[in-house]
Amino acid sequence: MKRNIALIFGISGQDGAYLARFLLENGYEVFGTSRDAELNDFSLLKELGIKEKISLHSVTLSDFRSVISILNLIKPTEIYNLSGQSSVYLSFQQP
């Protein structure tokens, strides 16, 4: 039986973190991305107790090669794009 592999773009946000928890609870292998996985503390993933169960990677969605690279590495069966700036103020400052 083929294992379900999920890739979540925007895993550090509220929706991405809760989706990751749901998928883990349902037997998925979960991978997540952030613009800079080295510097992000993923506080909500820690709070939910799932950070250590997820493989985290740095990906810049505006860089085609970065996206293709992660897709080729992980070969996900499902992809979720929950990335984006949720702060209205910051969305004008950093579109």
Model-derived regions: residue spans:
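N-terminal Rossmann-like NAD(P)+-binding domain of SDR-like oxidoreductases, especially those catalyzing
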Residues: 1-95
